[in-house]
């Protein structure tokens, strides 16, 4: 998407035009408040280091601004993966510094240590909350 003109910065992305909320059996267009409500309750479980909290909140903020530019969802997803990777590094190494390998390796190590649940043998990847 090209840069929006100043006068339309706060208009929803056109892809939100067809998203509706049902309230008391009446359909209405989704608003920024609705979009915010869908994001605000998504949070981290348990205590997380400040660095992880900041990285995760950055992802949520980007997702919020995607209401105005839908393409920001991709940026928000990448930031969320970065927050997940940072959380695994803290859990496995005790700090967010350099850890060997890829996110895949961190997930495998976390499963071996019990930090993440093991994948059920024979299950479909999409049924696994980490792999999906």
Task: State the predicted function of each range.
Residues 1-73:
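Charged alpha-helical initiation segments
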Residues 75-78, 82-132:
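Amphipathic, oligomerization/interface secondary-structure segments
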């Amino acid at each position: 998407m090209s840069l929006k003109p100043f006068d339309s910065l706060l208009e929803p992305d056109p892809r939100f035009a067809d998203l509706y909320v049902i309230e008391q059996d009446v359909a209405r267009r989704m608003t920024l408040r609705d979009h915010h409500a869908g994001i605000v309750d998504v949070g981290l479980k348990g205590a997380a280091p400040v660095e992880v909290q900041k990285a995760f909140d950055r992802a949520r903020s980007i997702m919020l601004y995607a209401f105005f530019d839908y393409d920001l969802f991709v940026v928000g997803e990448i930031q969320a993966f970065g927050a997940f990777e940072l959380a695994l590094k803290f859990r496995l190494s005790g700090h967010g510094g350099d850890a060997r390998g890829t996110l895949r390796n961190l997930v495998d190590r976390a499963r071996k240590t019990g930090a993440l649940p093991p994948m059920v043998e024979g299950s479909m990847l999409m049924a696994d909350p980490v792999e999906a």
